[in-house]
Amino acid sequence: MWLIVSEIVLACAALGFLRLRGFAIASLLPTPSLRGGIVGLALFFGAWLVGSLLVTPFAAGQPEQPIDRMMAEATFSMPVIVVMALVNGAFEEVFLLGFLARALRGFGLGVALGVPTLVRVSYHLYQGPLGAMWVFAVGLVFALYFARTVQLWPPVFAHVLWDIVPFVLRDS
């Protein structure tokens, strides 16, 4: 629960700072829509495919990853998981894509894609090497989509799904 509160507090502080600096905050707000949800579902599956292609060759013979232990020990209820996924998905995509990727676009597409993807991977390293590879694949797919469309809702929705689905599959 502290993660939800800390992300909300940090988001409010960051948005307040950006607003004081004259940044158009409205451009950072994802606009939910049915079409965006469908695209987000496609992004989810596309990221899963890219991640599978990247990670599978390295997965054989690997010891249990830290993320596997964390998932096995997690005892959150489904409503808490959904709230955490909504807050976390919006928090990460708004700042990594909506702000950082957009701010870096003037330095070229490679920088606008690479820096947010590497920042994303850096704070997911606790998941272990295979988890970091998954995060790299997912982050790159989301960044490519955003660079092409400048739409935030589909990556936010895909991220929310990415955070919820492992718990649903684990419990089924």
Task: Annotate each PLM feature.
Residues M1, F23-N88:
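Juxtamembrane helix-loop-helix connectors linking adjacent transmembrane helices
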Residues F17-R21, S33-G37, A112, G131-M133:
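Residues in flexible loops and secondary-structure boundaries
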Residues G16-F17, R21, L49-P57, S122, ...:
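Hydrophobic membrane-targeting alpha-helices
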Residues F45, G61, E73-S172:
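Transmembrane helix-loop-helix hairpins at the membrane interface
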Residues R19-A26, E92-L96:
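C-terminal ends of transmembrane helices
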Residues M1-G22:
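Alpha-helical transmembrane segments in multi-pass membrane proteins
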Residues L3-S6, L10, L41-F44, P116:
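Hydrophobic alpha-helical transmembrane segments of polytopic
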Residues L10-A14, L49, D163:
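Helical transmembrane-bundle signal
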